[in-house]
């Protein structure tokens, strides 16, 4: 397959564009449409040996959640026995980092354009409960028209990853761009941490250097905690004020996206770009979990990728795991519950599962995705219960493609 230069009869593989820790990126062409893509080839063996399988799966799921003009698009995911292939939007202009390294700081008008696109993408991600956590010029790409695209969601987190205190606790990111509260180890708000990183990026755009620089990391972190930086004289007063409000070491008083959008520097001249939603499936989701607020709303209509992500038969686990017992059309056991598709009416499913927590999402008018979770008890006891009692009781309502 790969020896012929064509992947799955669908993508013609071209030259290598770059290498990463777990594989390489090729230029490729979709032979069905002629579209040029960047094909990220990930070695399963390297990923598994590094213990990074969950991170790769999370990156894939997150990228399909955040369809936005200023986010690199993930077109398709494929897998073989040894590799995972990610067909990504090909962004030909290279990294923002390289542009600054070659040409130095940018003018205020160009900086404003890049920054607006960055904030639009970040705000959209936050609206869907996604926090990037590694925003930096190396992860910002430029297309041929000079538009900015956010890339590399490998360290991203979802709102559901927060602990009971509502905060994230995993310290990650790039030292020069990470917020001081992330390093403190007491938990942090992912949205506020991303905005700090946006502040560092804005400073780099306008100054051509980092705001906090020191050969000693401890000294650099000390400067960050104090907010100890100064802007070069060519940075305008309005830009200085915005940078200062973004690089506020106190996350409680740090400017929010809503406040940022109203600042004079951000609003100057051109209209503020707002997140663009391409289709209903990409609409922002309220992550606050107020179940009582949507009792009259219809179930969410899922697109094909959401179906793949939710269905136990078609989830992302097979990218790195092989379970011979799992196949489309069978409900399969997991430590916390099970998922299956069914054509049974919702009332019929509820009647069979009234002793368990049940959640459904409409995939099509006649097809439901059912998520069954155990209320408590030991996971080891759940598996025999599932195999011997629950699965047989559900076998006539679990849908499979062959049943259509």
From Swiss-Prot:
Catalytic activity from the UniProt record: L-seryl-[protein] + ATP = O-phospho-L-seryl-[protein] + ADP + H(+); L-threonyl-[protein] + ATP = O-phospho-L-threonyl-[protein] + ADP + H(+)
Keyword tags: ATP-binding, Kinase, Manganese, Nucleotide-binding, Serine/threonine-protein kinase, Transferase
Residues in Protein kinase domain copies: 11-266
PROSITE patterns: NAF, PROTEIN_KINASE_ATP, PROTEIN_KINASE_DOM, PROTEIN_KINASE_ST
Pfam families per UniProt: NAF, Pkinase
UniProt region (PPI), positions on chain: 335-356
Disulfide bridge partners, by residue number: none
Protein name: Putative CBL-interacting protein kinase 27
Gene name of this polypeptide: CIPK27
């Amino acid at each position: 397959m790969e020896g012929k230069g064509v992947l799955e009869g669908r993508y013609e593989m071209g030259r290598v564009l770059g290498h990463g820790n777990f594989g390489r990126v090729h230029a490729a062409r979709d032979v069905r449409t002629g579209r040029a893509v960047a094909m990220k080839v990930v070695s399963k063996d390297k990923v598994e040996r590094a213990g990074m399988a969950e991170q790769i799966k999370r990156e894939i799921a997150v990228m399909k959640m955040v369809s936005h003009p200023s986010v690199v698009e993930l077109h398709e995911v494929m897998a073989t026995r040894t590799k995972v292939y990610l067909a990504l939007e090909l962004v030909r202009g290279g990294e923002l980092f390289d542009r600054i390294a070659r040409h130095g700081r940018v003018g205020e008008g160009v900086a404003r354009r890049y920054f607006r696109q960055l904030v639009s993408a970040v705000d959209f991600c936050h609206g869907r409960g996604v926090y990037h956590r590694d925003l930096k010029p190396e992860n910002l790409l430029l297309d041929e028209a000079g538009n900015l695209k956010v890339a590399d969601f490998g360290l991203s987190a979802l709102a559901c990853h927060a602990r009971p205190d509502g905060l994230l606790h995993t310290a990650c990111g790039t030292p020069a761009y990470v917020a001081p509260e992330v390093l403190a180890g007491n938990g942090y708000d992912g949205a506020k941490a991303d905005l700090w990183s946006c502040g560092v990026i804005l400073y780099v755009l306008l100054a051509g250097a980092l705001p906090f620089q020191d050969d000693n990391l401890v000294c650099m972190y000390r400067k960050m905690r104090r907010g100890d930086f100064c802007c070069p004289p060519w940075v305008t007063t309005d830009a200085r004020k915005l940078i200062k409000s973004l690089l506020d070491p106190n996350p409680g008083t740090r400017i929010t996206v809503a406040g940022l959008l109203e600042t004079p520097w951000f609003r100057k001249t051109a209209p503020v770009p707002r997140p663009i939603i391409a289709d209903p499936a990409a609409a922002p989701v309220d992550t606050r979990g107020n179940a009582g607020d949507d009792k009259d709303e219809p179930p969410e209509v899922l697109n094909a990728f959401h179906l793949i992500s939710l269905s136990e038969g078609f989830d992302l686990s097979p990218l790195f795991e092989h379970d011979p017992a799992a196949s489309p059309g069978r409900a399969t056991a997991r430590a916390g519950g099970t998922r299956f598709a069914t054509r049974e009416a919702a009332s019929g499913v509820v009647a069979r599962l009234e002793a368990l927590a049940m959640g459904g999402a409409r995939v099509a008018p006649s097809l439901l995705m059912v998520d069954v979770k155990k209320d408590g008890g030991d996971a080891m006891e759940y598996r025999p219960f599932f195999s011997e009692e629950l699965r047989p009781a559900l076998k006539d309502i679990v849908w499979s493609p062959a049943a259509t």
